[in-house]
A protein has these predicted regions:
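"Short basic amphipathic alpha-helical interaction patches in structured regions
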Residues: 1, 11, 21-22, 106
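Short, structured patches in soluble enzyme cores that scaffold and shape functional sites
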Residues: 9, 65-67, 98-101
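Short, well-ordered, mixed-charge alpha-helical segments that flank or form enzyme active sites
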Residues: 14-19, 71-75, 103-107
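Short coil/turn connectors at secondary-structure junctions
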Residues: 1-5, 10, 58-60, 91-94
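Conserved thiamine diphosphate
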Residues: 24-90
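Short, hinge-like loop/turn segments at secondary-structure boundaries
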Residues: 23-27, 113-116
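Thiamine diphosphate
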Residues: 1-16, 79-83
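Flexible, low-complexity linker and terminal segments
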Residues: 89-137
């Protein structure tokens, strides 16, 4: 419907707050508490690419994917979030900002290893960028 709201979706490819279960965005092959042998698309299905999916809908004014793995990308993320709130304030429609992030604890990695996983695994699967910006119809 083009509601004037902004969603900030933190995508760390896991349900970390509940013990590390598979999420809709868990990558193929990624091990979780509920996929101990890795996510198998033949069994659990493929991950959902949220921005790509929502950008096809009428009523969505902004769909953008960013990351927070280094200072440059943190600044890009801040601008994207601000843009989402501006769209909301100006009644331009629904905005979603997807933020690729880490979960070192439930990924079983050090923070440095987790940042590298975002670079080498998540960004290739979930490319950064603006998927839709502007008219909501």
């Amino acid at each position: 419907r083009g509601e004037n709201i902004t969603i900030i979706f933190i995508n760390n490819a896991i349900y970390g707050m509940t013990g590390g279960q598979m999420a809709p965005t868990t990558l193929p092959g990624q091990i979780t508490q509920t996929t101990p042998y890795g996510r198998n698309p033949d069994v659990e299905g493929f991950p959902v690419r949220v921005c790509e999916m929502l950008s096809t809908l009428s009523g969505v004014a902004l769909a953008e994917r960013v990351t927070v793995i280094d200072p440059k990308n943190i600044n890009i993320a801040k601008k994207a979030i601000r843009k989402g709130f501006e769209f909301q304030k100006n009644k331009q429609g629904f905005s979603i900002i997807e933020v690729l992030s880490t979960c070192p604890t439930n990924w079983g990695m050090t923070p440095i290893e987790a940042l590298d996983r975002v670079r080498t695994e998540m960004i290739p699967y979930y490319p950064l960028g603006v998927f839709k910006e502007g008219a909501i119809r």
